[in-house]
Amino acid sequence: MKAVRINERLTIAGQPMIADFPSLSAQGFKSIINARPDGEEPGQPGNTQEKSAAGAAGMDYGFIPVSGPTITEADIRAFQQKMAEAEGPVFAHCKGGTRALTLYVLGEALDGRIQRSDIEDFGKTHGFDLCAATRWLERQSAAVPHIKAFFDPRTWSVQYVVSDPATGGCAIIDPVYDFDEKSGATGTMNADAILDYVKRHGLSVEWILDTHPHADHFSAADYLKQKTGAKTAIGAKVTGVQKLWQEKYNWSDFKTDGSQWDQLFEAGDRFSIGSLEARVLFSPGHTLASVTYVVGNAAFVHDTLFMPDSGTARADFPGGSAKQLWASIQDILALPDDTRLFTGHDYQPGGRAPKWESTVGEQTRSNPHLAGMTEEDFVRLREARDRTLPMPKLILHALQVNIRGGRLPEPEANGKHYLKFPLDVLEGSTW
């Protein structure tokens, strides 16, 4: 095992064996970062064994699996976070060390602590070829639009600020309004973090976009509209969702015309974010109103495709359809192979760090719900999987807010807001 000390906080290495972990702890390492996907070669210990061995040796452990071409800023920031959390020296590895060092160096470059022109020499000094790191930075600087993700670990949701570097115009996609179902408390921590980012970067919010009425969190669209004055928008088929849930909530006087938003997008509609053109794909299946927003070389695919190691979204909500979901996914996969895809949720399989960015090509090659699958195969798999899933714990809480455009129910005489729960209207009980 080749191990190279980069500085007093970080050592980069090739694959250690499980028997090495007690020795690493004895040498003073406090944390292990495994940057290697499972199954790369026979005999590789893998995430589960490494996590167990690290814990037994008294070390923290982080799993940030990457291959060179698929490194994203989420991986880089996750590496930095594990470094910051470590209570002492960190031992980071992949198969040979290059990917682990690449994650470190890219973080240093993004934060201005190393110049792009110095990266390859830095690598040579330590015995590594970091040409791929400089190429990554070149691609990243050329990518339009600029995208900043905000991950909410309470709901596994990913929110986005999508900005035009030429004008500073931006859109906010799928923002979360905080809600604690145990206490009934609401908050704006997620939305305020987005507003802080917008302010620090001198951006102007032009749109607040929801991809569909969410069943697992409240939308912060109305709160952000009040703070920014930006227009709110969603797919036009939201009126069908409103009618469906109007009946379930027994709201005879509820408006089901979509007037809670400033704009209802039809399939194929185009709009501007700064000087960038955005267009709308109709993407039903998860819900009957879901849409995808395509901006430059990026598509915001919400609850259709998850990361390639996580498959696809469920299609068993009222108005959902596995067959429609397959068709919607095929429309997304018809985009160019290098189109960046940004998902709406990440459930961190294997305990890995959260991720949200892939490409059309990666999904086609690596997603087990898609690679080598026919429509019939997919529908069979998706429906069988959905039969095992309980309803989301917030579905009855969230939809009565989200079909109102993110507005809480009107306060009652005492000034308090109240949610309404219909009983026995959904299948999927957990007993």
Swiss-Prot record:
| Highest rank taxon of the organism | Bacteria
Q: What induces it?
A: Repressed by BigR.
Q: Where does Zn(2+) bind?
A: H212, H214, H286
Q: Which GO terms describe its biological process?
A: glutathione metabolic process; hydrogen sulfide metabolic process
Which pairs of positions does the record mark as disulfide bonds? none
Annotated binding of substrate, by residue: D309
Summarize the protein's role.
Could play a role in cell adherence or biofilm development.
**NCBIfam families xref list:** bifunc_ST_SDO, TIGR01244 family sulfur transferase
Q: Which family does it belong to?
A: Belongs to the metallo-beta-lactamase superfamily.
Official protein name in the record: Beta-lactamase hydrolase-like protein
Where does this protein come from, organism-wise? Agrobacterium fabrum (strain C58 / ATCC 33970)
